[in-house]
């Protein structure tokens, strides 16, 4: 996959391959911003062939390159709208439609703009407002999926391995909100003692035997065959809602965008009742009760509601937006984790047992992943330089460049 992208990008200068270069750059940014959001510094602008050594960019430099490449693609692909040569090779839900790829790239730019809003609010606003003013438009009719040709990894991990079950936060929020998406996201428990309830597991608990919790809720039909979710219409509406809350030009109305985001998520999963759901101003996430070990019971640390509160503070409104965004992103754990790190929402339970030796804060939890040992062994000098770009040591407690503590406003 990486080799295909590299070969396409190297066609730069060949008029016949120009559109493939720009499309490849969109795919490259789609993949590599996730890598950067895991580790921080990455090999990107100086990447050359597949040699085992190479220089790293700081995350700030990488994001600057992401924005430049997306802008080039969004603008450059306009002249190719209507071209069909890409369609036979497009493994995404966009079907080779160049206009739709421009919308996706523009929506991705909005995601990345919001990601840096705390570390560089002026650049975030500039890039976000470019997304709103661009003639490319944003995703509104088609969710972005990739058809991989192989079983979704979560299907294997949940089913064949039996290593994933519903989380305690999902149980608290979906059950507390009486949210119909739970029936798509998860299967009812098959432990007879649980009477078909939707039951989750708290993070960081000690499990003496894996089989203890196997009867809890497994992944449901949300995992559909061989497709992997890259970006949804609902996410774009929630990005618009936050942008409106931040008074970005062209973002529209926060409440309207929030409600469109919820409705888009319900529609995506074939769940009804969104209109009634959005009027509920009483339900809140429920406290978590571990069906097997009451020592793991814990009260939910907040009282966020569903109906949008236009009279609330910016933080209260943002908590509503991100909580619903977090629900809607499932099962895209990478983006949900990034948004939790950026905003602190939704409110999640602290891990029960912290085995990090003091390196990772129990409450704010893991912030990044260490550089892989093989890279340290084979590219040590450059990894050492990359560690210098971080805000601390190479461990899971160190915040990324865009991960700024404190208020969101």
Question: Which residues does each PLM region occupy?
Answer:
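C-terminal functional modules
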Residues: 266-409
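Structured, solvent-exposed acidic/aromatic patches
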Residues: 1-274, 311-316
């Amino acid at each position: 996959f990486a080799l295909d992208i590299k070969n396409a990008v190297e066609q730069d200068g060949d008029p016949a391959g120009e559109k493939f270069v720009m499309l490849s750059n969109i795919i490259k940014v789609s993949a590599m911003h996730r890598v950067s959001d895991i580790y921080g510094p990455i090999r990107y602008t100086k990447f050359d062939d597949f040699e085992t050594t190479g220089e790293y960019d700081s995350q700030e430099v990488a994001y600057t390159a992401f924005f430049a490449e997306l802008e080039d693609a969004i603008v450059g692909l306009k002249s190719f709208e209507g071209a069909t040569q890409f369609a036979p090779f497009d493994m995404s839900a966009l079907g080779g439609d160049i206009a739709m790829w421009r919308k996706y790239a523009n929506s991705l730019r909005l995601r990345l703009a919001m990601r840096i809003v705390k570390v560089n609010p002026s650049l975030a606003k500039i890039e976000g407002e470019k997304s709103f003013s661009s003639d490319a438009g944003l995703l509104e009719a088609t969710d972005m999926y990739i058809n991989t040709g192989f079983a979704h990894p979560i299907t294997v991990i949940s089913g064949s391995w039996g290593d994933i079950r519903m989380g305690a936060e999902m149980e608290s929020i979906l059950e507390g909100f009486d949210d119909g998406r739970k029936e798509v996201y998860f299967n009812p428990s098959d432990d007879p003692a649980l009477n078909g309830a939707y039951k989750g597991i708290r993070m960081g608990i000690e499990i003496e035997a894996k089989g203890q919790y196997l009867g809890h809720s497994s992944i449901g039909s949300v995992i559909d065959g061989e497709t992997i979710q890259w970006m949804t219409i609902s996410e774009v509406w929630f990005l618009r809602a936050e942008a409106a809350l931040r008074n970005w030009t062209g973002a529209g109305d926060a409440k309207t965008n929030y409600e469109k985001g919820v409705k888009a998520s319900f529609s995506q999963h074939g769940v009804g009742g969104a209109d009634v759901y959005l009027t509920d101003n009483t339900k809140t996430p429920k406290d978590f009760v571990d069906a097997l070990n009451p020592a793991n019971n814990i009260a939910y640390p907040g009282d966020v509601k569903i109906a949008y509160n236009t009279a609330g503070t910016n933080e209260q409104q943002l908590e509503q937006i991100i909580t619903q965004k977090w629900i809607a992103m499932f099962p895209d754990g990478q983006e949900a984790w990034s948004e939790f790190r950026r905003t602190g929402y939704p409110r999640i339970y602290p891990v029960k047992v912290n085995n990090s030796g003091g390196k990772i804060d129990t409450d704010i939890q893991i912030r990044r992943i260490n550089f892989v040992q093989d890279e340290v062994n084979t590219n040590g000098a450059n990894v050492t330089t990359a560690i210098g770009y971080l805000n601390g040591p190479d461990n899971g407690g160190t915040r990324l460049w865009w991960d700024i503590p404190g208020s969101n406003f």
